[in-house]
């Protein structure tokens, strides 16, 4: 996919850069593989804000994605490549030889008419899903499981992938884009190839309103608030906040480590850069 630039006939078009989606499916998604979504506005069941700067946005249907690739040893044909408003990657509608339809994450270079399969021992081909023990070292992967049978969790965003760098003592060692090296059980599944839409990182929304369409509200700085609302608030005139950057609850921010799950730290061979 290429990038689209626009003639600056309005100020918001001057900086706008979008991904060219002319080759994607133009119709509606498959109805049997969609669900309705209700908006939370960033609120939990008590009505309190748990995720700031969320709200509004265009109504969306959720596409049910098969992250587990649970149909084993049955070939499927790629019917079409579609846009999914719920994620940055594109998705592929596949039809199995027994007639069942399914959505999967579309890897780069997957084309309409390609045949893919999920198997214990399949060809090392774009879109095929295999256990890590059956994949040769050096292969580029996406949608990698962290627990056997749970479904892919690693490398699902646009343009992402991991590299299989080693196997030892029942675990595979994978290298993430962040530079982290992590151990994953050899029986976990992964799909061959990199995720589609690598140009997603180069887009420019062009105007604030386009962010509102995506469900994001304005991000207000702490120094622009009153003292009751933020530790950086208040002061006469424009101030710098008067202290090291903190969250609205007074905890240090900008680089402070927040990961607390020491139980699974043993699976991280090398921390991210």
Curated annotation (Swiss-Prot):
GO terms for cellular component: large ribosomal subunit. GO terms for biological process: translation. The keyword rRNA-binding applies. It comes from the Bacteria. Disulfide bonds: none annotated. Residues 254-273 have a biased composition (Basic residues). GO terms for molecular function: rRNA binding; structural constituent of ribosome; transferase activity. PROSITE patterns: RIBOSOMAL_L2. SMART domains: Ribosomal_L2, Ribosomal_L2_C. Keywords: Ribonucleoprotein, Ribosomal protein, RNA-binding, rRNA-binding. Residues 228-273 are annotated as: Disordered. One of the primary rRNA binding proteins. Required for association of the 30S and 50S subunits to form the 70S ribosome, for tRNA binding and peptide bond formation. It has been suggested to have peptidyltransferase activity; this is somewhat controversial. Makes several contacts with the 16S rRNA in the 70S ribosome. Belongs to the universal ribosomal protein uL2 family. HAMAP family: Ribosomal_uL2_B (MF_01320_B). Part of the 50S ribosomal subunit. Forms a bridge to the 30S subunit in the 70S ribosome. This is Large ribosomal subunit protein uL2. It comes from Rickettsia typhi (strain ATCC VR-144 / Wilmington). The gene is rplB.
